[in-house]
Amino acid sequence: MDADSLLLSLELASGSGQGLSPDRRASLLTSLMLVKRDYRFARVLFWGRILGLVADYYIAQGLSEDQLAPRKTLYSLNCTEWSLLPPATEEMAMQISVVSGRFMGDPSHEYEHTELQKVNEGEKVFDEEVVVQIKEETRLVSIIDQIDKAVAIIPRGALFKTPFGVTHVNRTFEGLPLSEVRKLSSYFHFREAIDLKNKTLLEKSDLEPSLDFLDSLEYDIPRGSWSIQMERGNALVVLRSLLWPGLTFYHAPRTKNYGYIYVGTGEKNMDLPFML
């Protein structure tokens, strides 16, 4: 959700129980403005909160003028002091794949994992147990990246792509019409397209290049991983991810108000294919 309209956005997302105490709201309003100024971001998003056993991680993201350029991610434990996280890598994803369970809420906490490594001694080769330590900060970076790639979404028309390949906020976007808000095809993943590149020219013929340049939720796997509900007498549409429980997207039809927020434990629902 956009930090510039934080209070309204939190109100729209409150139907899912994603609320903040008054003092946290006040701290966020002030500190995110300072983050935007100090880091010279074009936009700042309040991404959400990852619940830990000892403390919670409050997450914010900074965007440049090109909305699909790599984002800067920051975390805070008190909504006042923000620390910049390193970019996510494939190596990080491999490292944290062996870690499960809840976050502790301490970035310096280290998880211990025992793995077998082959050791050569002369002509003999044998397996030796090695204890590998993985920092919670590394896990935090990778989980945020995974959630972003899988379930961060925007409504169709919220962004547009220039002929030069740069993506900007669409200032003329006035919201989705009521006839379109219940369709998964009206929502796009907020990342570079992956599936779109595999479509044939015939399939792309009906698409508007300046608007339909992202992957639609329509073909997400597994099918049925999104729940769509109309709330407040059709004045609000809410999408919830069943794959990453805690991700809520909201949009007030025929208005510019939309956004998403994640409030959860940072654990993926691996059983979803068997539950559908």
From Swiss-Prot:
Protein origin, superkingdom: Eukaryota
Subcellular location: Cytoplasm, Cytoskeleton, Cilium axoneme; Cytoplasm, Cytoskeleton, Flagellum axoneme; Cell projection, Kinocilium
Biological processes annotated in GO: axonemal central apparatus assembly; axoneme assembly; cilium movement; epithelial cilium movement involved in extracellular fluid movement; flagellated sperm motility; mating; radial spoke assembly
Disruption phenotype: RNAi-mediated depletion in the ependymal cilia results in a near complete central pair apparatus loss and alters the ciliary beat pattern from planar to rotational. Multiple radial spokes proteins, including those in the head, are markedly down-regulated in the cilia.
Keyword terms: Cell projection, Cilium, Cilium biogenesis/degradation, Cytoplasm, Cytoskeleton, Flagellum
Assigned protein family: Belongs to the flagellar radial spoke RSP9 family.
Role noted for this protein: Functions as part of axonemal radial spoke complexes that play an important part in the motility of sperm and cilia. Essential for both the radial spoke head assembly and the central pair microtubule stability in ependymal motile cilia. Required for motility of olfactory and neural cilia and for the structural integrity of ciliary axonemes in both 9+0 and 9+2 motile cilia.
Protein name according to UniProt: Radial spoke head protein 9 homolog
Organism of this sequence: Mus musculus
